[in-house]
Amino acid sequence: AYFKIHKFNSVSSFTNSRLWQQCNFKYKYFAKVDYKSCFNSIYTHTYKWIIERNTVDSKEAKNSNLFIIIDRVLQNINGKSSNGVIVGPEFSRMIAEILLQHIDKEILENLQIKGLSMPKDFRVFRYVDDIYIFANTPIITEAIVKTIVSTAQKYLLHLNELKYYTAETPV
């Protein structure tokens, strides 16, 4: 993942780590956001879009059965619905991770276009649907959040406004 939490197997091991402390020291601002009802909001046809965009020859993607298979499997385990991925099975988490990594990559590319670079201006970490942002200024923090919002909306995902948190780092 572009915004992965490295070798940590839980959020608490990340927030208790040296890396967390280093980010609190290096960056003055922190924000936490998460995707609202992440698994329930995943639209299964999204995988067709991802595969077609990441295939050099889009004709190959249209002739490929991969996206059809993924879509059917997701619908079959979710009562034939194309809206939402059932929470629980490891397969669902892996499938969600494919989408979220694709979104991570697109967010990073959009931030680079805006002249922001990681780790000079910011660091972003994502653990499943929770996103942790460290930045040098509140303007950068807001630009990152806006970029996450606009990118995620293209894939029918939204941030949970009730869980949006921002503060100055304690160090």
What are these regions (language model features)?
Residues A1-F30:
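Active-site-proximal segment of RNA-dependent polymerases
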Residues F8-S12, Q112, P138, I144-T147:
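A short linear-motif detector with a strong N-terminal bias
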Residues Q21-V128, I133-E142:
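Conserved polymerase palm-domain catalytic core
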Residues P138-V171:
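Polymerase palm active-site segment centered on the conserved acidic dipeptide of motif C
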